[in-house]
Regions:
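Active-site nucleophile loop of the alpha/beta-hydrolase fold
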Residues: 15, 44-47, 97-106
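Conserved alpha/beta-hydrolase "acid-adjacent" motif
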Residues: 21, 144-150
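Gly/Ala-rich beta-loop-alpha elbow adjacent to hydrolase catalytic centers
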Residues: 72-82
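Conserved hydrolase catalytic core segment
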Residues: 84-95, 104
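C-terminal catalytic histidine-bearing segment of alpha/beta-hydrolase fold enzymes
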Residues: 160-202
Length: 202
């Protein structure tokens, strides 16, 4: 990666989980900081309170506190948080990496929120308008929280290019991740596009 001064700040948006030391987003934040990259993390809010609006406010609070260009890196339910936030916020964003968004419109496995609970908490309907900034949706071929075909259709509605990750489950520790090395490449791709946009406008 290039120097922090030339690159956007990375804002990491977790899904419906608590803090997990072994999660790739946790490890990514540590790695970025070790490389002197500007990074902020929206604190995980667990599943005890599913209020979507509270999570959208948390993204907005962090985004508005960051000066300069911004890239979002979201996972799972965090991807849908970003979609809801993008409908409400005027904060410019240079790009977003949305990794394995879940399909909240279909029943999920036991232990995950029900459709009724998600609707009552403001997650449904899922926003399907094009997002107002460039995005990459990284989708899994065997995600237990959403079929590849339905996530691909959602990504198309958002105006996103789809990155086929192959068989990576839900890209979480239960699926063997851990460190996710490809995140670096995809973040660099989004960040480089942001830098090129700034040069073109100069």
């Amino acid at each position: 990666m290039t120097g922090a001064a030339a690159m956007p700040t990375v804002l990491i948006v977790p899904g419906l989980r608590d803090h997990v030391d072994a999660h790739w987003q946790t490890l990514l934040a540590m790695e970025l900081r070790a490389r002197h990259r500007n990074v902020c993390v929206v604190a995980p809010m667990g599943r005890g309170d599913l209020d979507c609006a509270a999570r959208v406010r948390a993204i907005e609070c962090h985004a508005q506190a960051i000066e300069g260009p911004l890239v979002l890196v979201a996972h799972s339910g965090g991807c849908l948080m970003v979609a809801h936030w993008a409908q409400r916020s005027k904060r410019p964003v240079h790009g977003a990496l949305l990794a394995t968004p879940p399909d909240f419109e279909q029943p999920m496995p036991a232990g995950y929120p029900t459709i009724d609970a998600l609707r009552a908490s403001g997650w449904l309907p899922v926003p399907r308008q094009p997002l107002p900034f460039p995005i990459l949706v990284a989708a899994s071929r065997d995600d237990p929280l959403g079929s590849y075909e339905r996530i691909e259709a959602l990504a198309n509605d958002w105006g996103s290019r789809v990155v086929d990750l192959g068989h990576v489950g839900h890209l979480n520790p239960a699926s063997g991740y851990g460190h996710w090395g490809r995140a670096d490449t995809l973040i660099d791709e989004i960040s480089a596009g942001a830098a090129q946009t700034r040069v073109a406008r100069a």
